[in-house]
């Protein structure tokens, strides 16, 4: 019998939890855990589900606020006017839809004629840290980070060290709250990293990371040494215009006049006013445009200038210029209706392939990695990029010494796209796969029919042991916060941790003695380990790192059997009774628990007080148990987005067409899967058909 998929409430809860974790990494720790595109897709999925089920919307949903709570080390500041984020556009269709919504609303309010186009103020989307500056009686009184949009961190002392931030404004209102971005120029970033490296100190990943880390120093003297810049781009609370400044009236509707607290009636005019007060405003590339065509032309123009700018941008921002129109359009909980951020795609660059090394994964997978001459791409300096596997290297004809195209896929994971053949040197060398593991010396074998070669050393191999532990501590497994790669490296290298069970015997005393671990950090890690003593059964099964057993399969197996003991003792036939578990997965689980060492680890976990909790059965949905296969390129949804929506509705997604396939979803260049589906009589849907099936 097919297992029921998650209810809308469960799907929403899962998405909220995942987004909140990403928010903490991005907003609090300045350490993004996923590409922007993946985060945006998660947020769109949650917004879609909440739109379908408004009764499930709660005030603490990520769609109702921005970011995450501030760190405890800084004082908290409550924003008088919330610091909202912006809605995102990723393609032309999104921009045109935004312009149409704005125009329709303004025409309905009598503020735009039928033959008129909306006028927008277009700006660069600076890639730094959002900051609010509060001036009282013309003096800088307080500075705060965005935080969660409602409450931020007090960074006044650090902001005062930035030379471009005025400590006093002349002719300012009694209260003026200025919003803007703190950033670091690329040239200054490179210079800072060279200095850091020469001192043996931490180097930063990119200018945004450097700016955020510099601003959030507890010691303002460190911030003062960093080359930070500030640009104002908006405002919050404004009260008490100076005497002598005439009162200005807005007309939010025909015949209605309202006194305004602002000295100008357009967004661009307000930025000019802020500049007149002495605040740094990035006016050089800002421009007014009309209608969607004007917005898209601005986007294209800035895209061509992007590489020549002295600082990083990750898109452009469109704002309705007229402030009365902005007030009519208003806000949703998370973003203004009158503004939109249009993001740039990933970047590509050309550099030299200096060499190819291999990395050993937790299952022994050998992954070739390109060592590159440093190149700035997608906002970071890239020196390594994935080559995936030996077959991929052959397919792309990449050779050591080649000039190669590097793409920062998803703006996070760099990959080698291919060689520039006309620049290939005469001494370019082909890659030859190693025959022995570079870490443990065990034989490297490539099973017949597989693309990936593997080290045969198992947990004897320190590299596999490290990756296994890192996997187990991860967010989708045991979620042990603070147990990261560098700490695991130290524990394995010292032979202190040989298996997952050893993690639970660690003490704060011995952890505090490790590099970069103080007493408080050690105590926090021990507390996180203690919290992981009662994981969901599926999480613990996933944490064991059984080959072919992913997060979803682990959860399905856990729900089917109910206890680790029953899973360990299950025959291959019993495992095959679990929906969507085939011979490969069943055999892999059976072989894993047939190994005495692995059973011993589970017993050791029990002795360390690890008691997994049974998985709850999900309630049924209309797509529960139905298997989908995706092929080709859909016009609007990415494959990942379509997959997430199917899973959220209770369906399953497979990589190959079979008699068990309920639907094949196709886009352009569908290929052989479409042919096979037609042969088997599998129903075929396009993107619109899938949306209809999902009730969208």
Curated annotation (Swiss-Prot):
Domain BRCT: 618-696
Short name of any one Pfam family annotated for the protein: HHH_2
Catalytic activity field: NAD(+) + (deoxyribonucleotide)n-3'-hydroxyl + 5'-phospho-(deoxyribonucleotide)m = (deoxyribonucleotide)n+m + AMP + beta-nicotinamide D-nucleotide
Keyword field: DNA damage, DNA repair, DNA replication, Ligase, Magnesium, Manganese, Metal-binding, NAD, Zinc
Taxonomy, superkingdom: Bacteria
Function noted in UniProt: DNA ligase that catalyzes the formation of phosphodiester linkages between 5'-phosphoryl and 3'-hydroxyl groups in double-stranded DNA using NAD as a coenzyme and as the energy source for the reaction. It is essential for DNA replication and repair of damaged DNA.
PANTHER family: CHROMOSOME TRANSMISSION FIDELITY FACTOR 18, DNA LIGASE
Family: Belongs to the NAD-dependent DNA ligase family. LigA subfamily.
NCBIfam families (alphabetical): dnlj (TIGR00575), PRK07956.1 (NF005932)
Name used for this protein in its record: DNA ligase
Organism: Bordetella bronchiseptica (strain ATCC BAA-588 / NCTC 13252 / RB50)
Gene: ligA
